Amino acid sequence: MQIFVKTLTGKTITVETEPGDTVGQVKQKIADKEGVPVDQQRLIYAGKQLEDAQTLADYNIQKESTLHMVLRLRGGNGLRKGKRRCLSLLQFI
């Protein structure tokens, strides 16, 4: 069955699935098609965040349903540390 995944940019991705596919499998199909890593994807349907181990049937997702994908932002402040190092070096020049 065909489902649609809409991104926050408004792009709609078409994904071929089966009712027994897990959310994790759907995320992998999106990763293969769009290059978005599985661990950065959050899928939402009917206002609920979908869990990787559950199937599409568990959420009553049927053909031509639309899921919404948002990206999980990575934590950390690696960039800020880099800036601090640069500033520290500049102080000695």
Curated annotation (Swiss-Prot):
PROSITE patterns: UBIQUITIN_1, UBIQUITIN_2. It comes from the Viruses. Gene3D superfamilies: Phosphatidylinositol 3-kinase Catalytic Subunit, Chain A, domain 1 (3.10.20.90). The keyword Ubl conjugation applies. InterPro entries: Ubiquitin-like_dom (IPR000626), Ubiquitin-like_domsf (IPR029071), Ubiquitin_CS (IPR019954), Ubiquitin_dom (IPR019956), Ubiquitin_ubiquitin-like (IPR050158). GO terms for biological process: symbiont-mediated perturbation of host ubiquitin-like protein modification. The keyword Manganese does not apply. There is a cross-link at K48 (Glycyl lysine isopeptide (Lys-Gly) (interchain with G-Cter in ubiquitin)). Residues 77-93 form a propeptide. Belongs to the ubiquitin family. PANTHER family: UBIQUITIN. This is Ubiquitin-like protein. The gene is V-UBI.
